[in-house]
Amino acid sequence: MNTFVVAAPHKCIGCRTCEVACVVAHSDKNIFTLASSKIKFYPRLSVIRTATVSAPIQCRHCEDAPCANACPEGCIVNKEGVIYINQKTCIGCKTCIVACPFGAIDMVSSYEDGEKKLQAGLKCDDGGKLCFKEKMVANKCDLCIGRKGGPACMEVCPTDAFRIVNSDAMERSIKEKRHQSVIGLSMLGSK
């Protein structure tokens, strides 16, 4: 079973600290020393707030990942139990966004050597002038693959709202639900 991270909405306060930690974890530079115009703020999770609840939405790393199955270029793969997007080969077709049942994938600008990458060979008509469009690629949670401390969002959450769901946690949850179900059934039989 693929591991994923989930946040408890009843604990989340919508502070977006997890989004900042995600950006820091995936940045090749110290964003705290950069001018705000130079920061590539592309978190791989999105905190959603409503009038009654807030929680981050992030990839569930599906077993039979619809995004991976939909990708015409094969850019989305299972890498060490993580559904991973190879942004270098992504063509920005957005098929994965349509396929994702959780809304966990965004399109972001592609960068190379700190500069926005332009689409190769695609020109657009801009008032009679030729211009080049920036290259956009898919972006989503990768569980901070390769990061020593694991997912950065979990490490910084002030309310400890995040938890890792892996096969052990899932098995414990199933056993607890079954236990509660038996208790409920036994109460029915005693009436």
Model-identified regions with their sequence ranges:
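N-terminal cysteine/histidine-rich coordination modules
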Residues: 1-12, 17-18, 23-46
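Flanking helices and flexible, charged tails adjoining ferredoxin-like Fe-S electron-transfer domains
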Residues: 28-69, 87-191
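Short glycine/acidic-rich loop motifs that flank beta-strands on beta-rich extracellular proteins
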Residues: 80-81
